């Protein structure tokens, strides 16, 4: 019995470690967007002064962004301040980011510099 508990505990610990590394190392802070995390595997399609559009297969207009991405955003100190359609507004201090999730496309817009 003790061996089974140890084995299950080890498997859970390894699973948690894998989840942590896969989730938290899949995103990088964006200098342009005040350190807001951006998926490493998202491809920049178009960039303007206050906005960037990424091609990202995990983005969905119907389901938004994956829960792992939400967790990373929250862990970096960004608070969700509202939703409007496909837009979700995040705030950290006096900085606001509008994240728009559409099918296979992620758009980030900063409120002001």
Residue ranges with predicted function:
Residues 9-10, 23-24, 68, 79-80:
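Alpha-helical interaction segments
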Residues 3-23:
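Hydrophobic membrane-insertion alpha-helices, especially the h-region
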Residues 1-2, 34:
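Short N-terminal helix-initiation segments at or just after the protein's N-terminus
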Residues 69-113:
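Structured, soluble extracytoplasmic/luminal domains of envelope-associated proteins
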Residues 58-64:
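Short, surface-exposed ligand-recognition loops at beta-strand->loop->(often short) alpha-helix junctions
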Residues 21-58:
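Compositionally biased P/S/T/G-rich terminal and signal peptide-adjacent segments
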């Amino acid at each position: 019995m003790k061996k089974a508990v140890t084995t299950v505990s080890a498997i859970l610990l390894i699973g948690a470690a894998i989840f942590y590394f896969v989730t938290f190392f899949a995103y990088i802070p964006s200098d342009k967007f005040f350190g807001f995390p951006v998926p490493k595997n998202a491809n920049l399609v178009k960039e303007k002064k206050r906005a960037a559009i990424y091609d990202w297969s995990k983005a969905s207009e119907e389901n938004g962004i994956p829960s792992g991405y939400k967790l990373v955003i929250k862990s970096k100190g960004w608070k969700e301040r509202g939703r409007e359609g496909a837009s979700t507004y995040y705030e950290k201090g006096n900085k606001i980011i509008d994240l728009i999730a559409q099918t296979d496309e992620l758009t980030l817009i900063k409120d002001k510099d």
